[in-house]
Amino acid sequence: MDAGPLLELGLAANGTVEVPSVADGNRIGWYTKAVTPGETGPAVLIGHFDTARGPAVLRNVSKIRTGDEITVSRADGTTAVFRVRELEQVDKKNFPTAKVYGNTARPELRVITCGGEITEGHRPDNIIVYADLVG
């Protein structure tokens, strides 16, 4: 998986992490309050599985497997390569905040999207990919 050019995401007015707009459904966002991909700590990327317009950038998340590589092009022209260590699907009400955003001793990556069957117009779960820097 290649993350492509990243959108910059911050915090929404309600204090939650921003997500890309529907218009940017085919782009992945980088949560700028976390570290830059490749730096020590968890870098966090967020993208849509789908939107009202149809499939989005992370529509193939179900094909990601442990051991797969994720390539992130950095603003400084270098590339960070991560290897998937774990995939997790959780109810949004039980989001593992400390596991996703907590400090780590090495460069790590989190990729977050929505999952589960649509209920009342929304997907109730988050799918989280955890990966470690390998190059």
Where in the sequence are the language-model features?
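Solvent-exposed, non-transmembrane regions of membrane-associated and secreted proteins
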Residues: 1-65, 74-76, 86-135
